[in-house]
């Protein structure tokens, strides 16, 4: 088990380090999610492996009509639905069909990008590590944090961050062309109103 005082690896390296198909697949995931290195993939794979291992164990117990197995399955699904990895209506087959991308989709870095708070996955990582992002009002600097569904809507820029200003270049770059046109029109309208008041 090891001494709880010391940190232990939360992942295991591939058994066959030079498999081309696996390397190609990992490289695609690395680029898609803007990950720092493959250890972040392996951590998610270790988590997924643990979930699926528990699900297979529960399936065997359910076949043996174990009364407590159904309750444990419900607790597992409830825990996964809390992180929006599965819905609360999910079944054992849904648990067994999970992929590593289902886990990676719930990382703070991925959600910041999907919420249009960053121009890319890599920029999302940078904003988080530099303290520009808050979750439920608290600054978070861990890109790999799994976000609970109840806190997803609370993800925002830190109020004292320069990026919280809508005129910041990053905020302007995030606007769609239609939003930019609308914003420019509003600025022009406000400027003309100010000019009219001064003339009076």
From Swiss-Prot:
Q: Which PANTHER family would you find in this protein's record?
A: 30S 40S RIBOSOMAL PROTEIN, 40S RIBOSOMAL PROTEIN S9
> SUPFAM superfamilies annotated for this entry?
Alpha-L RNA-binding motif (SSF55174)
What name appears for this protein in its UniProt entry?
Small ribosomal subunit protein uS4
Q: Which SMART domains match?
A: Ribosomal_S4, S4
Natural source organism = Thermoplasma volcanium (strain ATCC 51530 / DSM 4299 / JCM 9571 / NBRC 15438 / GSS1)
Output the Gene Ontology terms for molecular function.
rRNA binding; structural constituent of ribosome
- Which stretches are tagged as biased composition: Basic and acidic residues? 179-190
Query: What's the superkingdom here?
Result: Archaea
- Free-text function comment from the UniProt entry: One of the primary rRNA binding proteins, it binds directly to 16S rRNA where it nucleates assembly of the body of the 30S subunit.
Question: Is the Heme keyword given for this protein?
Answer: no
Gene that produces this protein? rps4
Residues of the region (Disordered) are 178-200
């Amino acid at each position: 088990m090891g001494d709880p005082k010391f940190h232990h690896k939360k992942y295991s390296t591939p058994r066959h380090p030079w498999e081309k198909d696996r390397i190609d697949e990992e490289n695609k995931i690395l680029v898609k999610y803007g990950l720092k290195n493959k250890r972040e993939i392996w951590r998610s794979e270790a988590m997924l492996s643990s979930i699926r291992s528990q699900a297979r164990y529960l399936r065997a117990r359910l076949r043996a009509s174990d009364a407590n197995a159904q309750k444990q399955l419900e607790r597992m699904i409830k825990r996964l639905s809390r992180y929006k990895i599965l819905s609360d209506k999910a079944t054992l087959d849904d648990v067994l069909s999970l992929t590593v991308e289902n886990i990676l989709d719930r990382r703070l870095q991925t959600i910041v990008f999907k919420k249009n708070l960053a121009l890319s996955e890599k920029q999302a990582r940078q904003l988080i590590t530099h303290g520009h992002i808050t979750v439920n009002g608290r600054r978070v600097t861990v890109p790999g944090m799994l976000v609970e569904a109840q806190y997803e809507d609370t993800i925002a820029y830190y109020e004292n961050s320069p990026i919280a200003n809508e005129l910041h270049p990053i905020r302007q770059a995030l606007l769609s062309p239609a939003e930019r046109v609308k914003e420019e029109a509003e600025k022009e309208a406000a400027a003309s109103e100010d000019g009219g008041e001064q003339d009076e």
